[in-house]
Amino acid sequence: MKATANRPLRVLHVLDSLAPGGLENGVVNTARRLHGRGFDIHAACLRFRGDFAERMPDPGKVVVLGKNAGFSPGAVRRLRTHLRATGADLLHSHNLGTLIYAAAATFGGRTIPIVHGEHGQLQPQDLTPKRLLQRRLLFRLCRRLHAVSAGLRDHLRDHGLDSGGRILATPNGVDSLRFRMAADAAAAKAALGFQPDDLVVGIVGRLVALKRHRLLFEALEKLAGELPTLRLLVVGDGGAERDELVAAMRAHPQAGRIVWAGHRNDLENCYPAMDLLAAPSEIEGLSNAVLEAMACAVPVLAHQACGNAEVIDRHRSGYLADLRDAAGLANELRAALGDPGELRRRGAEARRIVLERYSMEAMEACYRELYRGAVRA
């Protein structure tokens, strides 16, 4: 069934789940911008539903396919049936796992066109000849391909996955009305249990190894004697390392300086309590947390991974470094936190950049053209 002047274009997202995370947040933000404005947005979760399903514009249009461990032919059949039932005009998969199911359910994109998105750098297990060939072959079945930053697009190209120049960069956007500079930073700190003069370094994300929380915990231990007001604010929950990381926080020699806020739906109240956001992950495509912090005029110390490097100017709007170990991270934190005036100046410039280049309106326009182009092709 094709979209017409009288019927919106129907898009079905295929995800592992809608559990809280950066990828999922991007899907929700895009869906909320497009649904009811020329588009009808649905979602199918392979394994389970997830809390972010309730943030979708119509939670009733989120289904679970009941994928078992390993490859699940039953999930393919259920996805194929759901595609027919919804009358979807195109299917939007996210990262390799969901693309496998999208390709199988649509007979290689022949019954319904596939739009596919990549959201993070390839990991060692993705770089084997077999995995690279698998991605290359599956990419050929897609009507449109996109990556969430130009740096990620170039990263995929460097690994031979974009020989035809087909991958488009579709940067994430941030709601700059929701995420804004704190009217009262001291009050924001107090609400989370900090003192007004505490130096608060935050980290936001699921409790998984790829976010590299442990590196930040080690850096705190190294800096504890030098910076008596240094505190950590850890925002996020869930993930494969949740229990281990919670135990590590509780057993940390400086446990009294760590506030674990868990999963929060009011992140706009968390960033203003921070003097600096740490983003030591090495795999970010374009981190939602980085953009949200910048919109709140909070400067970011980030690993020079592909997406971060195009968002942060290391001399004006934040701090970029090769954060390969705790000693390096501690050195960068020491330098950044040692000049509060410079932190404020870089935070203000960070917000200006977000307003200029990473608006929700710009993101919406990217996806409108991506979807319309896929149907026209």
Where are these regions (language model features)?
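A conserved mid-protein helix/loop that constitutes part of the nucleotide-sugar donor-binding site
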Residues: 21-29, 199, 203-222, 240-244, ...
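Short hydrophobic beta-strand element within catalytic cores of glycosyltransferases
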Residues: 45, 299-302, 312
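Short His-centered aromatic/hydrophobic patch
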Residues: 93-99, 118
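A short, active-site helix/loop in glycosyltransferases that binds the activated sugar's phosphate group
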Residues: 142-169, 174-178
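A short helix/loop element that forms part of the nucleotide-sugar donor recognition site in Leloir-type
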Residues: 180-194, 247, 347, 366
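A short, well-ordered alpha-helix in the C-terminal region of glycosyltransferases
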Residues: 190, 328, 335, 342-357, ...
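Aromatic "clamp/platform" in nucleotide-sugar-dependent glycosyltransferases that forms part
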Residues: 263, 282
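Conserved acidic donor-binding segment of nucleotide-sugar-dependent glycosyltransferases
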Residues: 313-315, 319-326, 335-341
